[in-house]
């Protein structure tokens, strides 16, 4: 096919001296070079700003989109172009009895479609309480869902041939909510500049997924729109749920004197649901000092440096980059096909790999570690910034020293333990 695309946008703008309004709609579509290989998406974007008072402003935005993707292309790469599409009888030309590489047959008969919905909403307020004190609060919400439909007919596809038709429906839904509130105080007293920030953030994430598989269809007319036509003894059902929370408190102090001497002190506390009750919270301080030597009178007299700045900093940061529930025992149910029947395996873990059509490699990863805690990294930095020749030449020197403690990693266990691996610090 000739690749074609379309992108249409319609926008409306309006407002008063206190309110501004914007609404736009968008439709986008593209057709790939392959048959039944395309993508389309439609949605709208709404933005509103309103000054309730001269010192109090609220904002709201909402973005919604709905997409659809068909993915059936790419098979022509593996097919010799000298083979015809149809034989003399008008049927699809087959190289042999087990020909699973006919791109046109597979594209026309196999189904692989994904439908998505995405929502991004945000609301915020800014309150200038006094000239030196401002309060900001934000709420952000993100929602996404997808439904993937696949059907492999009993002819022309390997998965369908071995299973007398194979259908799959996979659903996913995720929600992310973030709340932030910060207060900022900035004041100048003669040569003294003071800035203080305090804030609180809360983040919650939850996702749910489910999957249905059906095989050995009595009638393939409706494909996976009639999953009940599959052999009930071979049907597979799966589902899962993941939920995490992160809470943070932040404090920062900035001080400057005569635009020469600068200091910053930051302290934050983070609590993550990924760790056990005794190790959910960790504290991360940091500090920095700098000296703008080019603002000193004795440096100005040299008339060489446009900038000469010495700086030093030290800070501790944290990492919680592990999957949730690693501190808990996890039990799962898996099925594998053996000698013409499905066998259920129940154990403290989950399936992470396959070994072909006749079995599933079961790597149990469910052993708990309630003592897991934050990975921390301490870093110090000493540097010099130099600019000369009317800022035409910039020179930067930096010395870093970074040390990580309590590194989060997977430890491989001996097979005799009955487990595959465990997360440790």
What is each model feature region?
Residues 1, 5-9, 76-104:
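Acidic, glycine-rich flexible loop segments
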Residues 1-36, 72-75, 105-113, 125-128:
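Residues embedded in well-ordered regular secondary structure
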Residues 41, 47-56, 60-66, 98-152, ...:
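Extracellular/periplasmic, surface-exposed regions of secreted and cell-surface proteins
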Residues 158-159:
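N-terminal, polar/charged subdomain of small-to-medium soluble alpha/beta proteins
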């Amino acid at each position: 096919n000739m690749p074609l695309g379309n992108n249409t946008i319609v926008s409306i703008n309006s407002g008063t001296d206190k309110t501004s309004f914007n609404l736009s709609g968008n439709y986008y579509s593209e057709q790939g070079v392959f048959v039944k290989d395309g993508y389309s998406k439609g949605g709208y974007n709404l933005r509103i700003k309103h000054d309730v008072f001269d010192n109090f402003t609220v904002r709201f935005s909402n973005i919604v989109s709905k997409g659809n993707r068909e993915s059936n292309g790419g098979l022509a790469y593996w097919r010799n172009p000298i083979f015809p599409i149809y034989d003399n009888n008008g049927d699809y030309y087959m190289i042999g009895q087990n020909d699973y590489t006919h791109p046109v047959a597979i594209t026309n008969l196999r189904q692989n479609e994904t439908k998505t919905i995405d929502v991004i909403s945000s609301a915020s307020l800014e309150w200038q309480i006094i000239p030196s004190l401002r309060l900001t609060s934000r709420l952000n919400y993100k929602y996404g869902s997808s439904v993937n439909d696949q059907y492999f007919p009993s002819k022309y596809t390997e998965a369908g041939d071995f299973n007398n038709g194979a259908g799959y429906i996979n659903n996913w839904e995720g929600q992310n909510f973030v709340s932030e509130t910060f207060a900022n105080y900035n004041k100048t007293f003669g040569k003294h500049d003071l800035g203080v920030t305090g804030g609180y953030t809360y983040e919650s994430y939850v996702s749910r997924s489910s999957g249905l598989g059906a095989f050995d269809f009595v009638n393939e007319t409706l494909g996976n729109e009639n999953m009940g036509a599959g052999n009930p003894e071979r049907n597979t059902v799966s589902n899962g749920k993941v939920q995490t929370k992160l809470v943070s408190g932040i404090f920062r102090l900035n001080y400057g004197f005569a635009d020469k001497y600068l200091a910053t002190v930051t302290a934050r506390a983070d609590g993550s649901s990924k760790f056990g009750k005794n190790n959910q919270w960790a504290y991360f301080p940091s500090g920095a000092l700098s000296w703008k030597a080019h603002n000193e009178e004795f440096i100005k007299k040299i008339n060489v440096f446009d900038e000469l700045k010495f700086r030093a900093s030290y800070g501790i940061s944290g990492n919680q980059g592990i999957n949730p529930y690693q501190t808990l025992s996890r039990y799962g149910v898996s099925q594998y096909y053996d000698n013409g029947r499905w066998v259920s395996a129940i154990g403290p873990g989950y399936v992470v790999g396959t070994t072909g059509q006749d079995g599933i490699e079961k790597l149990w990863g469910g052993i708990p570690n309630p003592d897991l805690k934050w990975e921390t990294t301490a870093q110090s930095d000493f540097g010099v910034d130099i600019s000369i020749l009317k800022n035409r030449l910039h020179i930067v020197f930096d010395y870093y020293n970074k040390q990580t403690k309590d590194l989060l990693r997977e430890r491989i266990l001996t097979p005799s333990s009955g487990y595959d691996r465990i997360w440790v610090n």
